[in-house]
């Protein structure tokens, strides 16, 4: 293919599948940088006395800020919503493409300058050491006088605008592009998950944009929205930020719920238990996500009755979440379970996400949250939900659908090695953090008393294991793309190809009840030029 055609295909692409591939590549690139930054954090905390950054606390704060923003905005969201959402949602609905194809293109390309801005913000002057929450007055002009915070805020603006355009696209596609005969109750769970994610993005992102814009004005135009001296209030920023932030954590995990539902159905060889209950549970989680934002703010001095309300409302979210957990377990019960790597990641997700949810119930209590606030207990909680929830669902989705997407099989044995290294690594990293938090170790501080050294060293060891697991995954994908046997010529190739690591033929072919399994492998660029008809 000529250079001109390549540029037309990949730079000016209006095809959802090509854009999804771009999202996957972008997410992998961002994840590699974000993982490198997490390695710096764990090297710094591997011992007392700031062994890696030599006491440069600002540099440490810049690293944790960049790590969080990269992992959330440039890894998990592009992979789950941009990658799997763009590729699978039109296929599951029987649509030829997304509703707004060119809007889809700009949604992706806005992320590239956004990533450049956030990386630049970490490199100019002293960097943006605000934490990813960008709290004022720490993010104000007195504390961060250079352009770093402005660059970080513009990065979040661009990323948010990209997500907003994508959300409009997904909602329109879901409502208008379903194929003939596909009623709402026939829509697969992953497509529902992407719809709810898009609705949450649409309702929450404008509020974040407002808060960040006020921050830009405070920094550069002498307003005082968050400045006490001028009659402003820094707590207002927290309300605006967390109004977006709490739905955001569900934006990160709800597409994962959709993927796990499909994976559990695949490995148990039976339909998901209680599909309508699953849909209502996701809707309830999304709706309740807007009613609990101040549980992040128990330590700022809320009234006791306000704290009582937010404690109760937060605990209510455990109900629809547990409906999902028990429905997955009920799906597995009595099924013919195939313990392939998709199954391992799905079961790992259910187990570890449940642990993260239980620590969330602990933190929902305002009386308990005040001592736990900003301690490593909170870090352990949200990493169990994200590092082992969202990220495990991404791996699970890759191992479930990549043979269909690429038409190439991955090496089953290597992928098992990836799972076990990852499972051990993340648990060894984050489980000790519960103990550190209970002992009172504060987060975002780059040194600590000698009493905390034991569990910190264990956590740093775990992070090394996780990094090795990530390298193994990159090799699995490389091996899949170079040695993965095409489904078309699979029968012709010798089943006993001599290879130390085994053959890529161990993968069991899976076909499911949803429309994406009915098209060719790999799917053509416009899989449904003629609408599929469901009876």
From Swiss-Prot:
Catalysis performed (reactions) = 4 Fe(II)-[cytochrome c] + O2 + 8 H(+)(in) = 4 Fe(III)-[cytochrome c] + 2 H2O + 4 H(+)(out)
Q: Which residues bind heme a3?
A: 381
What does the entry list as the binding residues for Cu cation?
Answer: 246, 295-296
Co-factor binding comment: Binds 2 heme A groups non-covalently per subunit.
Of the GO CC terms on this record, one is:
respiratory chain complex IV
Kindly list the residue ranges recorded as spanning the membrane. Answer: 21-43, 63-85, 106-128, 153-175, 188-210, 242-264, 271-293, 308-330, 342-364, 379-401, 414-436, 456-478
Binding annotation for O2: 250
Q: Name one Pfam family in it.
A: COX1
Q: Which cofactor does it need?
A: heme; Cu cation
The reply to whether Iron figures as a keyword in the UniProt entry is yes
A single BP term in Gene Ontology? oxidative phosphorylation
> Cellular location of this protein?
Mitochondrion inner membrane
Q: A Gene Ontology molecular-function term?
A: heme binding
Q: How does it sit in the membrane?
A: Multi-pass membrane protein
- Enzyme Commission designation: 7.1.1.9
Entry keyword annotation includes Hydrolase: no
- Annotated Mg(2+) binding lies at 373-374
**Which InterPro entries has this protein been placed in?**
Cyt_c_oxase-like_su1_dom, Cyt_c_oxase-like_su1_sf, Cyt_C_Oxase_1, Cyt_c_oxase_su1_dom
1'-histidyl-3'-tyrosine (His-Tyr) crosslink, residue number(s): 246-250
Q: In which pathway does it act?
A: Energy metabolism; oxidative phosphorylation
Complexes and interactors: Component of the cytochrome c oxidase (complex IV, CIV), a multisubunit enzyme composed of a catalytic core of 3 subunits and several supernumerary subunits. The complex exists as a monomer or a dimer and forms supercomplexes (SCs) in the inner mitochondrial membrane with ubiquinol-cytochrome c oxidoreductase (cytochrome b-c1 complex, complex III, CIII).
The entry's function note states:
Component of the cytochrome c oxidase, the last enzyme in the mitochondrial electron transport chain which drives oxidative phosphorylation. The respiratory chain contains 3 multisubunit complexes succinate dehydrogenase (complex II, CII), ubiquinol-cytochrome c oxidoreductase (cytochrome b-c1 complex, complex III, CIII) and cytochrome c oxidase (complex IV, CIV), that cooperate to transfer electrons derived from NADH and succinate to molecular oxygen, creating an electrochemical gradient over the inner membrane that drives transmembrane transport and the ATP synthase.
Q: What is this protein called?
A: Cytochrome c oxidase subunit 1
Starting at the broadest rank, the lineage of the source organism is: Eukaryota, Fungi, Dikarya, Ascomycota, Saccharomycotina
Coding gene?
COX1
